[in-house]
């Protein structure tokens, strides 16, 4: 049977003539400059920032000449996550993570901006004059002077937007617009409505009932009449799902038809710039006509009042009259799904207090006008008069979370779609000047997923070559350490824990090569002072100096006489037998009030052979921790022991300092859980300050993990040294502290924006996924909430 439908080729109707120097030229001599737009990430923008973005759009649009069309086009395409399994060095758990997210659907957002210079006649053409309806298109010539002025205005437009610091424009090249042999271009993608890389040109069917592109059926909802708009528009709106009575989550006014609409769709936003003065003069004339006809009809009188209000607004505030149009073009290859999509689009428009208008008549011409570079073909009857400020309120202003452009990082998950993200919170922020160190401060109440997140982070750092030293108080890392030990055949994954049968044992005087640098000697001296003095005792310069001299003399002794076994026992014997005699024979006597060696020996007796704690500093195993990449010190059973806890902590810190100094060019990570409380003693204050300020110079980072805010407040040393020198702050669910969060906010120096983000954690979690949310703030300037979601295999590793 013969097809009686009218047919034509795309080539005959194609409205574009050429793309030269990155400019799209139509057959009607309209010239278009195309940009890719980089918008801020979803849930990370405040009301004030939305107003700033809005102000920049308005300012930029005003630099364009008359008879221009600003066409902002947001693409939202459903895609499936493709796991990265091709890397050779991936661990079993990393592969499990990738497989867990295999083919997970998500909505990919791309935003483009087309600035088109047309003519007065073209700007007022109606749909029946569209290039889609004309039999022949006769090319016209471009005016050189007009083109030059327009391109200069486009450069100003780009500069204004980029100077905002919130939105970034990047001009598209010719290859990106038309494509190459190996990659499809923007125009090809539009005609196929397919994701990037999958493009094949499709037949386009225009009928009275529907429009089809290949197998896809289109549905179009338009905002083309002022009566369809809400009574009031704004730059942003409150997102109730993630807001509390103490915090606001803000989204752009048009966000319901953006990322929150989970179907394949394109959101087109048009601002058509006419001669504002001429437009206002026409309205003045129309108002006079309405006035003269008001006696015949009340509607004429009402219309005159509306026109007067519009004119008064324009003249009072110096506003520019423009025309605008907005439409949501959605599609599906399934008829039933399309019905649901129509309902979804309608309900999302209704949530903006707009009147949903399903447009079936103008679908082909509006689709045609939305071709990149063909905005001048827009039918004038589909637009309504407004001002720039109101029109821009209906722009979408946010996008998906972005991956970090860095080879190093951890895998987190987009909280909206559940798509895995590559996130660098150590190196890239320092490179960009967002942070000045890699240190991190982690705060999360019990049950908030703190250990869950830390296990996830630590494993990935270790797999990327980092040396990790952990001080734990709850067996949180036992499973991970055991897995590493089994995988390396016992070569790595050292787990120290205290039991009565096998207590923790160290040897601070042991080194493989008998090399003791200044830091090593200082750490031994600090350890000995801690053994000797209580927290309340003040250490004098004489005591510190004499003990330092004794340590240096003992080290010289063991270096020259290798028959002496380095240990606390032999050091104690050296102090008791040799150093005490040398002290007594000096010409300048050292008074007991200045340095009481007998008191020191008596106090330290319990750590010497036969004493209560003779096991602690006299280990015979002599494990070289320098080469071990994953070390866990589990000290839960001694955390309340005032004798052992500070000593063990100092030894651990000394081990990390040794790594920090001697391992050049290797990432080092010290993670201290609740054990950090012991570091706040008077003897350790300077040591702590030194480590936190110095670790960044040695490619290292210190991470403190706690669940109690009060502990931080009570320690000025911790407050000053840890918080002030941790540019990366990580907070988990704080809703149980909501009523006293102002105190946390003041302590951590959080902004209102960061407070709102933190209080939104876990408020709107997807019940079909198992995950916990976490807030990560970098340098007080960049922050977002991410999801920690892992595979079943990773869950099984945890104890």
What kind of feature is each model-predicted range?
Residues 426-448, 452-459, 468-478, 494-502, ...:
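Conserved P-loop NTPase motor cores
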Residues 31, 109-111, 467, 629, ...:
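The start of beta-strands in P-loop NTPase/AAA+ ATPase cores
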Residues 47-63, 258-262, 271, 354-355, ...:
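P-loop NTPase motor domains
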Residues 85-90, 127-132, 373-376, 483-488, ...:
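Short secondary-structure boundary/capping segments
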Residues 23-29, 102-107, 316-321, 413-415, ...:
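Short glycine/proline-enriched loop/turn "hinge" motifs that connect secondary-structure elements
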Residues 39-41, 74, 117-119, 332, ...:
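Short, flexible loop/turn elements at secondary-structure junctions
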Residues 1-398:
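Extended, folded cores of ATP/NTP-driven motor/assembly subunits in large transport
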Residues 752-799:
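Conserved P-loop NTPase
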């Amino acid at each position: 049977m013969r097809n009686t439908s009218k047919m034509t080729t795309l080539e005959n109707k194609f409205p574009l003539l050429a793309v030269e120097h990155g400019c799209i030229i139509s057959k009607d001599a309209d010239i278009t400059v195309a940009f890719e737009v980089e918008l801020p990430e979803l849930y990370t923008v405040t009301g004030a920032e939305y107003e700033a973005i809005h102000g920049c759009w308005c300012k930029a649009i005003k630099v364009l000449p008359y008879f221009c069309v600003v066409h902002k086009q947001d693409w939202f395409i459903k895609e499936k996550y493709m796991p990265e399994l091709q890397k050779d060095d991936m661990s079993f758990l990393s592969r499990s993570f990738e497989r867990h997210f295999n083919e997970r659907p998500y909505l990919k957002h791309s935003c483009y901006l087309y600035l088109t210079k047309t003519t007065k006649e073209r700007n007022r053409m109606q749909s029946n004059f569209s290039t889609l309806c004309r039999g022949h298109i006769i090319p016209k010539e471009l005016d050189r002077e007009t083109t030059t002025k327009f391109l200069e205005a486009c450069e100003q437009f780009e500069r204004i937007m980029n100077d905002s610091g919130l939105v970034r424009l990047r001009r598209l090249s010719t290859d990106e617009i038309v494509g190459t042999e190996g990659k499809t271009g923007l125009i090809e993608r539009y005609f196929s409505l397919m994701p990037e890389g999958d493009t094949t040109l499709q037949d386009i069917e225009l009928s009275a009932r529907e429009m089809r592109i290949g197998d896809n059926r289109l549905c179009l909802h338009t905002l083309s009449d002022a009566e369809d708009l809400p009574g009031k528009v704004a730059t942003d709106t409150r997102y109730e799902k993630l807001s509390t009575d103490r915090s606001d989550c803000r989204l752009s006014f048009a966000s319901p038809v953006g990322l929150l609409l989970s179907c394949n769709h394109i959101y087109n936003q048009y601002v058509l710039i006419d001669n504002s003065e001429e437009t206002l003069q026409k309205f003045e004339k129309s108002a006079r006509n309405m006035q003269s006809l008001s006696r015949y009809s009340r509607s004429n009188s009402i219309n005159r009042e509306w026109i007067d209000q519009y004119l008064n607004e324009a003249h009072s505030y110096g506003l520019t009259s423009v025309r605008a149009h907005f439409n949501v073009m959605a599609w599906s290859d399934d008829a039933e799904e399309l019905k649901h999509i129509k309902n979804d689009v309608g309900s999302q428009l209704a949530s903006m207090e707009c009147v949903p208008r399903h447009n079936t008549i103008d679908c082909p011409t509006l689709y045609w006008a939305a071709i990149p570079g063909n905005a001048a073909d827009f039918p004038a009857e589909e637009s309504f008069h407004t001002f720039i400020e109101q029109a821009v309120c209906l722009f979408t202003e946010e996008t998906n979370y972005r991956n970090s452009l860095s080879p190093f990082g951890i895998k987190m998950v987009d909280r909206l779609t559940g798509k895995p993200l590559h996130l660098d919170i150590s190196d890239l922020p320092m490179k960009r000047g967002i942070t000045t160190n890699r240190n991190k401060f982690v705060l999360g109440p019990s049950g908030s997923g703190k250990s869950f997140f830390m296990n996830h982070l630590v494993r990935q750092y270790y797999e990327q070559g980092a040396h990790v030293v952990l001080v734990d108080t709850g067996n949180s890392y036992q499973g991970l350490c055991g897995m590493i030990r089994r995988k390396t055949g016992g070569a790595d994954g050292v787990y120290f824990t205290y039991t009565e049968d096998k207590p923790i044992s160290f040897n601070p005087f042991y080194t493989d090569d008998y090399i003791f640098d200044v830091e090593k000697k200082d750490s031994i001296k600090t350890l000995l002072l801690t053994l000797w003095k209580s927290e309340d005792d003040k250490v004098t310069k004489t005591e510190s100096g004499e003990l330092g001299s004794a340590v240096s003399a003992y080290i010289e002794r063991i270096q020259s006489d290798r028959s002496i076994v380095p240990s606390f026992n032999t050091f104690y014997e050296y102090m008791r037998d040799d150093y005490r005699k040398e002290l007594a024979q000096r010409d300048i006597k050292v008074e007991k009030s200045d340095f009481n060696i007998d008191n020191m020996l008596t106090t330290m007796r319990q750590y010497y052979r036969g004493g209560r704690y003779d096991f602690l500093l006299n280990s015979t195993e002599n494990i070289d921790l320098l080469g071990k990449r994953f070390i866990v010190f589990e000290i839960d059973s001694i955390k309340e022991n005032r004798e052992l806890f500070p000593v063990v902590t100092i030894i651990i810190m000394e081990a990390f300092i040794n790594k920090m100094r001697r391992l050049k060019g290797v990432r080092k990570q010290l993670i201290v859980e609740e054990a950090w409380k012991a570091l706040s003693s008077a003897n350790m204050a300077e040591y702590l300050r030194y480590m936190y300020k110095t670790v960044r110079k040695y490619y290292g980072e210190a991470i403190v993990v706690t669940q109690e805010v009060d502990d931080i407040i009570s320690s000025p040393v911790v407050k000053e040294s840890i918080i002030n020198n941790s540019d990366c702050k990580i907070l988990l669910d704080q809703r149980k502290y909501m009523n006293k969060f102002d105190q946390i906010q003041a302590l951590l120096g959080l902004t209102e924006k960061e407070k709102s983000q933190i209080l939104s954690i876990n408020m709107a979690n997807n019940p079909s996924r198992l995950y916990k949310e976490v807030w990560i703030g970098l340098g007080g300037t960049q922050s977002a909430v991410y999801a920690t979601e892992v595979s079943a295999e990773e869950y099984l590793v945890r104890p």
